[in-house]
Design a protein with these regions (language model features):
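Shared catalytic-loop signature of beta/alpha-barrel
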Residues: 1-94
Length: 94
């Protein structure tokens, strides 16, 4: 796991990932907990589509060491698969 090597070598200030790249919710949670063990934030980047972003948001709500949810703009190309899509409000909150 490259994330562990980066954390051990203090080669980064935070770790990142998403459900599609890290191999699902369980692996994403494990990587977030690894970051927490090294007193780092784990930031979740855009999942590439609406369904992945729902899974990403579930992880974000389950961990303490995160500060933001990345949204790619313009977002129309990544919005599909949900009846009611995720919307970011004027206040920046989901």
């Amino acid at each position: 796991m490259r994330a562990a090597a980066h954390a051990l070598q203090q080669a980064t200030d935070f770790l990142r990932g998403d459900v599609a790249v890290k191999g699902g919710i369980t692996t994403l949670l494990k990587t977030a907990h690894l970051a927490e063990a090294f007193r780092m934030n784990f930031e979740v980047h855009h999942g590439g589509n609406s369904l992945n972003n729902v899974a990403n948001l579930h992880v974000i709500m389950a961990i303490r060491n995160t500060e933001f949810f990345e949204v790619l703009l313009p977002d129309s190309a990544q919005k599909y698969g949900l009846v009611e899509d995720i919307a970011v409000g004027r206040d920046g909150l989901v």
